[in-house]
Amino acid sequence: QRDRLIEDPSLIPSAVEESLRMFPAFAHFRRTASCDTELAGQTIRQGEKVVMWYVSSNRDESRYEEPDRFDLRRKAEHQAFGAGGRHFCLGTALARLELKVMLEETLARYPRIALAGTPAHVQSLFVNQLKSLPVTLGAPAAA
């Protein structure tokens, strides 16, 4: 996939969206029902706690073909920043821009960057965060 991004940098925004789908910053979010409602045949009473697991919804087999495969051509639909409305992440545009610039600059400077070990994750049920990501940079691109 790295080579495809180098050959066609127009795919970088797709890589950003697919990364956000597969690796959202937060694993879940909890809300309190403000009124009685029904969701997918399940009654939810006012005051009950409801948890939305981003890591599950973003890999829902009924919604995504091969949900555990990173696919640069996948349609950009995910809940990494919420589902809109009052509880939508205000930092969405900045987060996307930061990821886009990071990918553009890293791939331009180090086109042979590669994974050099197993990523270590922070042990948390709430945040989806890396503790370490071993990589080899390879030789810098010619200036």
Question: Where are the predicted features?
Answer:
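Cytochrome P450
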Residues: Q1-A143
